């Protein structure tokens, strides 16, 4: 699913998982503007894309929260841009709060069991 972060054609991305709270951003083909929450799962071939390029794009496009799930390192760096909180490291044993919601948590220990 394409996400056009701004007017530049260079900022069309395809996040692994995204949450869009404003349905007006959807036009039937893509999301026009920043999603509220994005999770990218690191692919072994190009981790810099998620750790550097997309981090830069998402922060500047006003994505509220961005997680990077790294199955190889078994880490989840959390970036809560809305509060200028960057790169808080969690491990797969943790239950992590989705900061943009009051009562939403993701239990990575359960995901870790599925990966092993």
Annotated model-derived regions:
Residues 1-61, 68-116:
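C-terminal interaction segment
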């Amino acid at each position: 699913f394409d996400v056009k972060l701004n007017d530049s054609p260079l900022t069309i991305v395809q996040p692994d998982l995204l949450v869009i709270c404003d349905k007006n951003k959807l036009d039937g083909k893509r999301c026009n503007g920043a999603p509220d929450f994005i999770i990218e799962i690191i692919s072994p071939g190009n981790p810099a894309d998620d750790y550097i390029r997309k981090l830069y794009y998402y922060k500047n496009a006003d994505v509220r929260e961005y997680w990077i799930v790294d199955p190889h390192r078994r880490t989840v760096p959390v970036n809560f841009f809305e509060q200028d909180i960057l790169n808080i490291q969690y491990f797969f044993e943790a239950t992590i709060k989705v900061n943009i919601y009051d009562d939403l948590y993701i239990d990575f220990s359960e995901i870790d069991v599925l990966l092993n």
